[in-house]
């Protein structure tokens, strides 16, 4: 192709607008470049070095060729691998740059030279200099020459930027001092554009800075002393740029400084005062451009995040900037747009996140998390006082907004008094005349309901009336938003307390769901209906939903009709949220009320299958994600309906699992942009979608295993081929795929002729082992894997007991124990490293360090407890068959954990020690519970002493008392009549009585303390059942003992298992007409029975099929007591409102 034809081709690539013709032109261009590389390079170099209108465009295309091909292949192809040809081309480009006056032309030419310099210097710095001496000679001759234009100096610095991107070792070999001096000269240049180019060089160098400021002799890093000189000059230079109102160059310089603070904030440590002056100097004057203020806010937030001891160095300066600028900026919504806000479908995301408001919100979120409660909350209280004295709309908005933004960062240490202050402030603001302020109050309540839960919910008497009142706000956006806050608040509110407001909630839902066409009203009312499914009794929820289901189904019908008319339509976030809430509400109602919803389930699933086919313009795949979540809910409740929908679901999931979450950007060769480097993109939405897909699969495998069996082999192959279980960068995707692997054996057992259980076990177990051997650096991941393993162990062991197929039994058991031991070792190491890092973090004060260490130890404790669950699963699933490996494998684990507690106890008790003791005892409890007394006794006997000792009240570690009281109770239940237990009764009764008394007094109020209380109460009852004479002698007679116990039993509420145990005990006493219950203690017994059976756990008890005998016994008791005159009605009247409500529903159903 001759030069004229090539120039014409370039012109067409640059200007052609017709899509089809443009594609033809581009295809021709690519074909020419591939088939005639020598001609292509010769022509494009001619264009680059000419003065044609296409020269800059050609320079961009050629640089991309150089960068994307890896070895400057475009040039080398032209010379058939001859470096001299490359050299000639680059010298020509250099000479062309030296003769230019246009800044754009110089920029594009310098970028080509920069890429070339980077390539020849990165592997051999000194040899690379020899390959291109002309450049370094020109640099020395021209850069400092008085006649050199600022544009050319910028071009040279653009080239130097690429050299600075190499490791500092390479820079020093090239001539480090000369390059450093050159950058210093650029920073001091009179032209701001030159200074900006020099700052970009500093930014490239900063990647190799020494953040510890200790080792200045290591030539692989730039000493901080040099970097700090650079940064100091940048900070000095910026005010002059801004003073000249050269905001464009100042913005570029500030962007680079922000990057430096982000990558190596320690460099700024000696300049905190200078940065403070710079920040205030930019934020104070009103005439300074907002773009600079936005960047300055980011700079300040990075300063707070990345300088370890910033609070000690500059607490006063930080406080001033937060109070004077960050807080007020959090109220700067654009009031001129309020009318548009009122009609917006998405008022919650209406404000521009690129405004000062958006930047301030983001910065305050980071700052509050970094600086913490002790710095931020006092400033909030001061700002509230300031806003009260200066109650502008923006100040009032800022107050509520600040509470919202800082909630997560302050949650660790916030006190009840702080929450009261916060609620009272919000109550006052809730009456503000401006809609935006009232809306922000609701945003704050919604966020605080999550971050300060459950303490925040203890003030429901203040918050709930406010929310139900604001649901009737004259501004529909505010009224609708109140429902969102209600959903968050109710999520952590106790069921009994929710019932206090049920009558106020129903008209709110009716108004916003049935009587409003406002999108946000409909969306949030659907969410509120869904949230009440877990709170209300089924009958109450059914009564509510009878009116709502037809209306919600009508909503869904309208959505489907709209999508059918425009299957490729674009849906904004509010519309997507609305559809997702419909799907959520319908699937939850279907799951909660299967009989009521049964007529609608097939049409719903049919419509959901149709949703799979719509190509909605939604980059985040939100609608597909919500559809899959709805499917996962429905499969749990309607497994018999599901198999006929299996094929389209599996087909869609296969499409999802084939998606790539990482894509290399195919840069459009013909698009001219400032940032046009080749890169790759990770799509979190694909990862989320695949994680949800595995969640759906695991539900199908559990609920319809036989129907899934034909797909199992292909599914496991997909996991292996894509390495979801070993190589995924998404924790949830990895864990969900492992959960599916652990469920595979259940599928094989359900359909052994389709999927051979031994073969599936061999494959799935091998995959599980591979997953555990992949890189894991988080305690939580080990815990989650162990949680999935418990399910696998249960399914596998049940199969062994039913089939006696011992093919790989011993090998499997040994490997599980080996894996768990390795998990334990790895978690210990991670715990030690995490604690060491926290204790060495200078940015944390002692109280924060203690809190974070405690949280980390809690994670470790949860992991050890989960490992104990896996060990205990063997006992539960195998019973006495587990004896084969109990002594050689499990008992050493228990001994090791107990010994760790006892041997280190003299040095004080830590959370980790407690975890090992409680976990060891919980395994012993499983052995007692699931093995026969004859086989379990010898295993447990060596540990009885430590169990009994630790029923003694330990106020600091009451969870020890909880598990030991529970296990001691099991000993009396399983080994009833054993004379060795009788001698323990005085000690145990004294310990239980002390624990009960302390908790009852209110001295201990934690969840663990309340559970320990429940266990102590049932322990005393189990001792009385096993040894009634001994207990009667110690308690003033059995009648007196049971009278006292029944009063205590009525208050058992935390531990569901102990609630059930207490109910069973009372039922059995009624069944045998025990005089200790049926005579003088009848009222006590009935009150305790009603409080327990119709209390907080009533719903979960009656919906659990394993409790059929208990439910039948409870019905018998109520029938039996009905013949005792008015005693039942009188006793019910003394019970709580919630108990009365549940009892009333029970009687109405029975009638």
Swiss-Prot record:
SUPFAM superfamilies: ARM repeat
Keyword line: Cytoplasm, Nucleus, Protein transport, Repeat, Transport
Major location (coarse): nucleus
HEAT repeat segments: 1-36, 37-82, 83-132, 133-175, 176-222, 223-269, 270-316, 317-377, 378-416, 417-453, 454-495, 496-540, 541-593, 594-642, 643-704, 705-756, 757-811, 812-880, 881-932, 933-978, 979-1027, 1028-1074, 1075-1120, 1121-1151
Coiled-coil ranges from the UniProt annotation: none
GO biological process entries: positive regulation of gene expression; protein import into nucleus
Localization: Nucleus intermembrane space; Cytoplasm; Nucleus
Gene Ontology MF terms: nuclear import signal receptor activity; nuclear localization sequence binding
GO cellular component terms listed in the entry, alphabetical order: cytoplasm; nuclear envelope lumen; nucleus
Free-text note on domains in this protein's UniProt record: Lacks the importin beta N-terminal (IBN) domain.
The protein's role, per its UniProt record: Functions in nuclear protein import as nuclear transport receptor. Involved in encystation process. Constitutive expression enhances cyst production and increases transcription of endogenous genes involved in encystation. Level of mRNA of the transcriptional factor myb1-like protein increases in early stages of the encystation process followed by increased mRNAs of the cyst wall proteins cwp1-3.
Family recorded in the similarity comment: Belongs to the importin beta family.
Listed name of the protein: Importin beta
Native species: Giardia intestinalis (strain ATCC 50803 / WB clone C6)
